[in-house]
Design a protein with these regions (language model features):
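Surface-exposed, charged secondary-structure patches
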Residues: 93, 97-171
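Core segments of small alpha/beta cavity-forming domains
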Residues: 42-115, 123
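Short beta-strand edge/turn micro-motifs at domain boundaries
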Residues: 156-172, 186-226
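Bacterial N-terminal signal peptides that target proteins for export
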Residues: 20-28
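A mature extracytoplasmic/lumenal domain signature
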Residues: 72-75, 126-128, 138-142, 212-216
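Single conserved hydrophobic/aromatic residue that forms the stacking wall/gate
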Residues: 1-15
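C-terminal motif of bacterial Sec signal peptides marking the signal peptidase cleavage site
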Residues: 37-40
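Intrinsically disordered, low-complexity acidic Ser/Thr-rich regulatory segments
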Residues: 110, 173-189
Length: 226
């Protein structure tokens, strides 16, 4: 009986050792799978510089916020608010030292310039990456809306003078501004397409974006003043 007990004990011992071996193999296998999954989850997706530039331009100039908001992981409402506030602030700054225009006049002028922005014609093309900096080429068709603005302003001002109106009156001044822009909008023409290269790089927080200087470069090409 004792011998039989020892025999059964050996069997159980071997079974236990086999189970431990299997458990060890299972642990290693699970460990490998977990490592693979963690690696896949922690690996950041490649930044799509082309989509970023396209959606940025669509949002800032054509008022199309969906893709831009998705890339920034914010709501369309917040994206729209952010862009509109920046734009309105830049318009307001133009009149900080001026007393001859009302808030309504500034708002009307800003609304008219929003129409100008929608004239922007661009096509995002090639992307090159080097040392974490993306160079994106954008083909733009320059609008002459600002090139004709001085002439439009002169024409509108002369019309107001003929009507006996005072150009220093805040309402008249605002009317000259908005009507001049409208006049240039109506005779807008596009020039020969040009290619502009802009850089998309990480900011201090590690997020990719277009610096103001790069956006200004694109805007100067789309809406030249000379």
């Amino acid at each position: 009986d004792a011998q039989e007990s020892r025999g059964l004990g050996d069997v159980y011992k071997r079974q236990g050792e086999n189970m431990q071996k299997k458990n060890c193999v299972l642990c290693i296998s699970i460990g490998i799978i977990v490592c693979i999954l963690l690696s896949a989850c922690s690996r950041q997706p490649d930044f799509d510089a082309k989509s970023y530039v396209q959606s940025s331009l669509d949002a800032h100039y054509h008022g199309e916020y969906k893709d831009y908001a998705n890339l920034l992981e914010i709501s369309e409402k917040d994206a729209k608010k952010e862009i509109e506030e920046d734009f309105n602030e830049s318009i307001q700054q133009q009149f900080d030292d001026s007393d001859n225009i009302t808030d309504k006049g500034i708002a009307d002028y800003a609304e008219k310039l929003t129409e100008v922005k929608k004239l922007a014609k661009y096509k995002v093309q090639d992307v090159k990456e080097e040392d974490g900096v993306y160079t994106v080429s954008v083909q733009v068709e320059p609008s002459n809306v600002f090139q004709t603005l001085q002439q439009s302003s002169t024409e509108v001002s002369n019309e107001k003078i003929k009507q006996g109106l005072d150009g220093n009156d805040p309402e008249v001044f605002a009317a000259v501004l908005t009507e001049s822009v409208q006049k240039s909008l109506e005779k807008n023409r596009y020039g020969k397409a040009v290619t502009v290269n802009v850089s998309v790089e990480k900011d201090n927080s590690g997020k990719y974006g277009l610096l103001d200087t790069e956006m200004n470069k694109l805007e100067a090409a789309m809406f030249p003043t000379e």
